[in-house]
């Protein structure tokens, strides 16, 4: 790229300076590595833990939709990140660093769609867990219907909303990155992000209350069958809330930092190239989230499965030795006493 700067569009010069900015460049490589690394825990969790888990089919359908969307997002963004890292090596001119408008618009549309689909699933998971709590005694017998219907509905709803926003998108030039949202729809897209963040925050608070209710129900039932049913609901609810917590933390941080940098970043960075580099660096947080949620889910599932086994074994022992065992012992003595009294009365 030894071309003269004369008659070169400003966008091409900006793309060149940003592409070789050390902060931007290093974080683009970091994003590529994290997206590639996220494929392994996500695939392992879905195939070898989630599909083989004892979760009810409704919850399992929603979790498959949630983690499946994240996995597809990682694959699509991995391709896009590879293109962004590759362009500086193969470009002969500064303008070659810009992604062509039609590819940029398609890539950004797919990115926003796949990034926002998982934000709907925590809300549906909490709703499904609420139904499971209310029907805890016989929920395991409920047929699998609610989960798949909710999963399909959420994907279609998000697709409709994203297309509604992108209907007004005006893309006349290329972009150095697929993740930079077109200026013509940036405000609406960020409002959508804020709305989903608020909903997810309220949802997490409600999920926490739901978990406490599950714990109370589990303690209030003394029969072995009821304990087994409630333990299953409690464990799966606790796992879901742990995943929701990771989701809200990363998505909330990403949304907050991205919006602050876009609208207030110029107060901290006078050089637009430095600001663009920092914005691009923080946008790689989503790849970190994809990796973190995969690893965290494998870990959470392992921990709660072990705790569930210990809890069930403890319940079985309690029936014989604990408070329930004492009640059973008193009942047995009372029955023996009644039978003895009845025999004595008959003999007189």
From Swiss-Prot:
GO terms for molecular function: transmembrane signaling receptor activity. Keywords: Membrane, Transmembrane, Transmembrane helix. InterPro entries: 7TM_GPCR_serpentine_rcpt_Srb. Coiled coil: none annotated. Its main location: membrane. It is a multi-pass membrane protein. The keyword Membrane applies. The chain crosses the membrane at residues 31-51, 63-83, 107-127, 145-165, 191-211, 241-261, 280-300. PANTHER family: SERPENTINE RECEPTOR CLASS BETA-1-RELATED-RELATED, SERPENTINE RECEPTOR CLASS BETA-7. Belongs to the nematode receptor-like protein srb family. This is Serpentine receptor class beta-7. It comes from Caenorhabditis elegans. The gene is srb-7.
């Amino acid at each position: 790229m030894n071309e003269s700067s004369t008659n070169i569009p400003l966008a091409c010069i900006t793309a060149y300076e940003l592409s070789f900015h050390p902060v931007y460049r290093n974080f683009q490589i970091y994003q590529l590595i994290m997206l590639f690394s996220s494929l392994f825990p996500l695939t392992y969790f879905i195939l070898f833990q989630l599909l083989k888990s004892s979760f009810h089919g409704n919850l399992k359908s929603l979790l498959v939709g949630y983690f499946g969307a994240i996995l597809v997002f990682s694959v699509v963004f991995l391709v896009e990140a590879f293109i962004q890292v590759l362009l500086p090596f193969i470009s002969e001119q500064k303008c070659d660093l810009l992604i062509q408008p039609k590819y940029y618009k398609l890539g950004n549309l797919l990115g926003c769609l796949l990034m926002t689909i998982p934000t709907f699933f925590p809300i549906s998971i909490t709703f499904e867990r609420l139904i499971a709590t209310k029907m805890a005694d016989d929920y395991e017998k409920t047929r699998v219907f609610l989960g798949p219907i909710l999963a399909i509905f959420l994907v279609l709803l998000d697709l409709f909303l994203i297309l509604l926003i992108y209907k007004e998108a005006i893309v006349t030039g290329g972009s150095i990155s697929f993740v930079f949202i077109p200026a013509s729809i940036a405000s609406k897209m960020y409002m959508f992000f804020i709305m989903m963040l608020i909903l997810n925050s309220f949802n997490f608070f409600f999920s926490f209350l739901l978990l406490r209710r599950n714990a109370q129900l589990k303690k209030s039932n003394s029969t072995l069958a009821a304990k087994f049913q409630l333990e299953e609901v409690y464990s799966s609810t606790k796992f879901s809330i742990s995943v929701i917590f990771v989701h809200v933390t990363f998505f909330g941080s990403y949304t907050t930092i991205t919006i602050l940098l876009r609208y207030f970043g110029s107060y901290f960075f006078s050089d637009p190239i430095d600001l663009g580099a920092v914005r691009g660096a923080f946008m790689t947080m989503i790849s970190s989230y994809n990796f973190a949620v995969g690893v965290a889910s494998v870990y959470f599932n392992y921990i709660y499965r072990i705790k569930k086994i210990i809890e069930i074994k403890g319940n079985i022992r309690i029936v014989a030795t604990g408070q329930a065992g004492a009640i059973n012992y008193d009942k047995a003595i009372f029955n023996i006493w009644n039978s003895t009294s009845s025999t004595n009365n008959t003999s007189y």
